[in-house]
Amino acid sequence: MPIRYPNGQPYSRSPKQGQAKKPLPADTYSGRGMTLEQDIDEANLYYLSQQRAVVHKKPTPVQIVKVDYPKRSAAVIREAYFKQASTTDYNGVYRGAYIDFEAKETKNKTSFPLKNIHPHQVDHMREVSKHGGICFVLIRFFQSAEVFLLDAKHLIDYYDNQDVRKSIKKTEIERLGHQVKTGLHPPIDYLRTLDAVYFNGDAKERT
């Protein structure tokens, strides 16, 4: 059964969990060669195994186009399309708080294009923030493999002022955001950054 993205391109299944990975270059421990989402998925599995957090990627909705019924009691999907996700990529619970975030990667060296964020995602971030959830975006600059956590309020401010600038300078992300430690286990340790930004370091209570 062919499954396609909203633009009509065929869906290619990513390697199954457990398959051997290509060795990383000797000069880095970060997930070069892996997508940002793959690194986050691996980090989330690590956090779950260590009983630190429960965070999952939200499933992408699928629109079924063609269904055959070879048997009265069975249906076979012949054609389907991925629909555009209505919210952000990930959500879960950490230290008793609801967290919700988007993951974006850019090949630009000096800025992050705001066109990578969709209006419905910004609307969702507004609502999560308004109701007290921890909401942010993880941005990876592909060329340098640097990952930054930017709180939703800063992203929303820039998004609402696109008549002034269509992107966020990397220097602004460095100033307003927080660089996330990368390594082996986990490949992207964003919980460490959450501790520093939202939980006053090792404090029990949120700041």
From Swiss-Prot:
GO molecular function, a single term: endonuclease activity
KW DNA-binding (keyword) present: no
SUPFAM superfamilies referenced in this protein's UniProt entry, alphabetically: Restriction endonuclease-like
Binding site for Mg(2+): T87, D89, E102, Q121
Single GO cellular component term: cytoplasm
Keywords: Cytoplasm, DNA damage, DNA recombination, DNA repair, Endonuclease, Hydrolase, Magnesium, Metal-binding, Nuclease
EC number, UniProt record: 3.1.21.10
Family according to the record: Belongs to the RecU family.
Function: Endonuclease that resolves Holliday junction intermediates in genetic recombination. Cleaves mobile four-strand junctions by introducing symmetrical nicks in paired strands. Promotes annealing of linear ssDNA with homologous dsDNA. Required for DNA repair, homologous recombination and chromosome segregation.
NCBIfam families on file: PRK02234.1-5, recU
GO biological process entries: chromosome segregation; DNA recombination; DNA repair
Cofactor(s) required, per the database record: Mg(2+)
Residues spanning the signal sequence: none
Lineage, uppermost ranks: Bacteria, Bacillati, Bacillota, Bacilli, Bacillales
Gene3D superfamilies: 3.40.1350.10
Region (Disordered): 1-30
Organism per entry: Shouchella clausii (strain KSM-K16)
Sites marked Transition state stabilizer: K104
SS bond partners: none
Record has DNA damage as a keyword: yes
Compartments where found: Cytoplasm
Protein name per UniProt: Holliday junction resolvase RecU
Cofactor note: Binds 1 Mg(2+) ion per subunit.
